[in-house]
Structure formats: C-alpha cells, structure tokens
A protein has these predicted regions:
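Sequence context surrounding c-type heme c attachment/ligation sites in exported
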Residues: 6-84, 94-149
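Residue-level detector of conserved, well-ordered beta-strand and adjacent loop positions
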Residues: 87
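N-terminal secretory signal peptides that target proteins for export/translocation
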Residues: 1-2
Length: 150
C-alpha cells in the first residue's frame, strides 16, 4: 500500500512538472533606455557579474526555459531589476542613485552579491578581490561626486 502511494505521488509530481512545461515562461528584456555611463573596467565587471539580474540585457541560459527553474529565474531577475537596474541608471534621480550606490557598497562589503547559487551556475561571475576593489573605488568616487553636487 505504501509503495503504491509513493509511486502515485511520484507520478503526480512528474505529471505536474510536465504540465508546467506547457505554460510559456514570461521572460522580458526591455530595451536599455538610460544605461549606466562608467569607466570600461567597471562596466566589464558589472556586465559579467551583475548584468543578468541587474540590467535589461539578461542572458537566459537554456535551463531558464524549464519550469520550475524558469519561474525562479524570472522572479530573481525581476527582483534584481527592481533593486537596481543598470539599464535605467541615468533615469534615476540623484537620491535614488546615491541609495543604490550605498546598497552596492554594502553588498560588496558583505560579499552577498552575486549570490552563491548564481555563481554556481555562472562560474565566471565571481568577484575577485581586485574586482571588488575596482567597484568600491568607483562607488566611492560616485558618492563623493554626488555629495559635491557634480
């Protein structure tokens, strides 16, 4: 009896996963309307390690077309874009840019970005100490520039 119930439950789960593949994932990549203007080394690091979730130029690997991974990936990208979107950077007002720079500084310091699960799937996304130093210097310069009203 127990054995049959396990097979039934397993079959129901497989059926649900198969049915989930029929609903297309709603991935979006809106055009970049006001992209970030930053030095080339900074842009290179941000594109490599942050761009998939924090820009409108997301690279969607094949596995993001498979439910339920597709739903998780879409949720993460939408959340990342809401937090900070480098494709919309120039459209943020000065206070919003300052807030987002401070958030980036905290994320760099705590090493919470990029998330470990993203780094597992994207080995090249890891931020080295040199990458963190480059980004930190740029953030400090941007915050100083914002404070002086430039």
């Amino acid at each position: 009896m127990r054995h049959a119930m396990r097979w039934l439950a397993g079959g129901a789960i497989l059926l649900a996963l198969a049915a989930a593949q029929l609903a297309p994932a709603r991935r979006s990549d809106p055009p970049e309307s006001a992209p970030l203007a930053a030095p080339s080394p900074v842009l290179k690091i941000l594109t490599r390690s942050c761009g998939d979730c924090h820009s409108n130029d997301t690279r969607w690997p094949w596995y993001t077309s498979v439910a339920p991974v597709s739903l998780l990936a879409i949720r993460d990208v939408e959340g990342g874009r809401r937090q900070i979107n480098f494709s919309e950077w120039s459209a943020y007002n000065a206070a919003a840019r300052r807030h987002k720079l401070q958030w980036m500084h905290r994320a760099l310091g705590s090493e919470t970005m990029p998330p470990w699960e993203y780094q597992l799937a994207h080995p090249g996304s890891h931020l080295s100490a040199a990458d963190r130093a480059t980004l930190s210097r740029w953030i400090d310069a941007e915050l100083l520039s914002a404070a002086s009203g430039k």
